[in-house]
Amino acid sequence: MKIEEALAQYPKEDLTRTPTPLHFLPHLSEDFGLNFYLKRDDLTDLALGGDKPRKLEYEIAQAKAKGADYLVTCGSAQSNHARLTTAAARHLGLDVAVVLSHDQWHAIQGNLLTVYLMGARVEMIHTEDHWDLEEHALALCDELKAEGKKPHYIPV
C-alpha cells in the first residue's frame, strides 16, 4: 500500500499549499561533495508554516467531523504549535484556547504575541511539566462543554 492510499482513509482539512519546494544548496553541496537540498516548509502559507500544519490538517478534520466549535491545545509560552493551531482555528472560523507555561523569562513577543493578536483565549500556568499543561487543557475542555461549547483537544 502506498502512503497516499493509507492517508486517503483519513479526513483532511486543506490548510497548506503543498508540495513545498526543494532548494538546492550549492555551497554546502560543494563543501561536502554531496547534493544538499532544503525543504521549504516555511512556505506552506499558514502562520510561517513548518511541519506542524501537515499534522493539523488531520487533527482539525477530526475536530470538524465531531462538530467542534472550539480548539484547545497547550505548549510553552513561545510554542510554534500553539501559534499554528490558533492560526488554523481562526482561518476556519473556530474559537481557540491555548494553555501555556508561564516562566519568569517570558515576554509578550514572538509566538505569544501572535497568539494574542489572533484572538486566542490564553491561559498561562506556572509549571515546567508538560503533563500539567495537558491536564489543565483537558479541564478547560470540560469547562467549555459546561458552557455549551463543543471543544476538541489537539495534543502537541
Stretches with model-predicted labels:
Residues 1-156:
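PLP-dependent amino-acid enzyme catalytic core
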